[in-house]
Each structure stands twice: as structure tokens, then as C-alpha cells.
Amino acid sequence: MSWRSEQIWIELIPGSRRGSNFVWAFILFFGSLEFILVGTASYFSQNLIAFFPQGMVMIFYGISGLFISLYLSSMLFWNVGGGYNQFDKTRGVICIFRWVFPGRNRRLLLRFFMKDIRSIRIEVKEGFYTRRLLYMDIRGQKAIPLTRTDEVLTPVEIEKKAAELASFLCVPIEVL
């Protein structure tokens, strides 16, 4: 989702709050509860499975699954990776904001001047898992990714996005 005018372009980044992450957290939580229930029932001689070693392993896997589902749920709650990209022509500033894990530096805010942007770069990696990424090259700094690594874009979509951004920022496009 994005909002655009003549002078400002704001692009919202969803982060970890995606439908697939909610589904996996739900499946993992209830699956690990089932593992714990089966392991506990075997301990109390319900004759489902033998407690040693199957019941112990089931309890171990259940507890591990609960910890992983807790981690996934906390990522969803904190919206890790979410934020926005703001391109402001009036002030000549680009702001990239992301939420990260809680702590002293929970907010990640990068600011750059528009005059320091060299180009918008499209990087294509072919192979079994084809990736197309959009970067912003800045003088004296590393390239900053503008798309998520797990975001699958067709060649037409990535070219359109790069062309719109390059024309808005008045910079060239590089393809690697």
C-alpha cells in the first residue's frame, strides 16, 4: 500500500504481519499442545504410546514447538520489519523507518538526502529460487533494499516499481 502526491511518496511496509505467519503460529501452537498432551498421557499410563523414549520425545518436541510459536506470536505482536519508506521532494529527504525487536533501539530510522542517491538498482538472481530485488544506491554507503527478500515480484512488476520510483526521484535505473 502506498500514498503518492506530486511532492511526497509514502510506501507502507507490512513486516511480519502476514496471513501465512498467523497461520503458522496457530498451527504450531496447537500442534505442540497435542504433542505435550500425548506425551503427558503416556506418562500417566493411558497406553497411547510408551513413555520411554517416545513420550519423553513428544513432550520435548511439544515444549520446543511452544517456544517457537511464542517467538512467532511475539514477532506478529511487535510487527517486526514493518514500517514505511518516505520520499519527500519538498525537503529533499528520504526516510526509511522500520520496527525491530524491543530494546533500546526499537525504532530504526534512516535518513538520506535525495541528492546523495546515485541510482535505483534491480538485482536479479536466477536459479531454483529466483529473486528480484530493488535497491537504492547511495553515495558513500551500501545499497539499501527497498523490497523484502521474501517478496516474489514478476519482472514486469519490479520494472514498473523501479521506473516509477526512478522517475519520482529523477535518478537512473541499473540492472544487475
Curated annotation (Swiss-Prot):
Seems to be required for the assembly of the photosystem I complex. It is a multi-pass membrane protein. Keywords: Membrane, Photosynthesis, Plastid, Thylakoid, Transmembrane, Transmembrane helix. The chain crosses the membrane at residues 22-42, 48-68. GO terms for biological process: photosynthesis. The keyword Transcription regulation does not apply. It comes from Cuscuta gronovii (Common dodder). GO terms for cellular component: photosystem I; plastid thylakoid membrane. It comes from the Eukaryota. It is found in: Plastid thylakoid membrane. It holds the Pfam family Ycf4. Belongs to the Ycf4 family. This is Photosystem I assembly protein Ycf4.
